[in-house]
Amino acid sequence: DFRLELTWLRDHPQKYDLGECEFHLALSVPDMDKAHALHEKLGCICYENPAMGIYFISDPDGYWIEIVPER
C-alpha cells in the first residue's frame, strides 16, 4: 500500500517548472533507519534535516524526493 499526495497550485503565477526544487514528492517509510542506511549506501542523499527527522534523496535527473517517517 502507498499514498500519493498531490498539490494543486491553482494561483501559481507562471508555468510550473520541474527544476524549481521548491515543489517535490515526499514518501513515507515505516523504518527511517533502514531507509536511510539504504539511501546512504546508494549515495543518493542530497540533504538532511535531523531536527525535523527528514532527509531528501536525489533521483537520476536531480529532482529531490523527501523521505519522512510513517506516522
Where do the language-model regions lie?
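Vicinal oxygen chelate
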Residues: D1-A26, H36-S58, E70-R71
